[in-house]
Amino acid sequence: MEKPFKFKQFTVKQDRCAMKIGTDGVLLGAWTSVKHNPFSVLDIGSGTGILSLMIAQRSHAEQIEAIEIDDDAYEQCSENFENSPWNDRLFCYHASLLEFVEEVGDSFDLIVCNPPFYSEDYKTENKSRDLARF
């Protein structure tokens, strides 16, 4: 098992996620503006849940929902949410964006996403990593 990624107020485990926490995700979480006091937030392709957790730490949003399509990443994201100080405001759905929109149909005050950036072939030997990159 890998060492968890520790922040001041929470810890993120990432040993089961294909895409690990990187500088871009941490910066996006820090730079995402919450000055308009969002009530509801959606994190698309949440991975470890890092963006949702950082927004929960920095805001008073009452509903922070994340969606993750990969089985292992979904389980790890859910565990990271459960183990956080904001577990009453965080929820992860195991679904694609299309499935989520068709089933839930809510609107959100803030939507965040940290898509992978690949200009050419994204395929690797790891199917979970390929899914996270696509």
Feature map (PLM): residue ranges:
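Class I SAM-dependent transferase core
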Residues: 1-36
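Conserved class I S-adenosyl-L-methionine
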Residues: 38-45
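Glycine-rich SAM-binding Motif I of class I
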Residues: 49, 53
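Conserved SAM-binding motif I beta-strand of class I
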Residues: 63-68
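Short alpha-helix immediately C-terminal to the canonical SAM-binding loop
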Residues: 74-75
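S-adenosyl-L-methionine
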Residues: 78-103
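A short acidic, Gly/Pro-enriched loop at the edge of an enzyme's catalytic core
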Residues: 102-110
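Mobile active-site "lid"/loop adjacent to the S-adenosyl-L-methionine
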Residues: 115-134
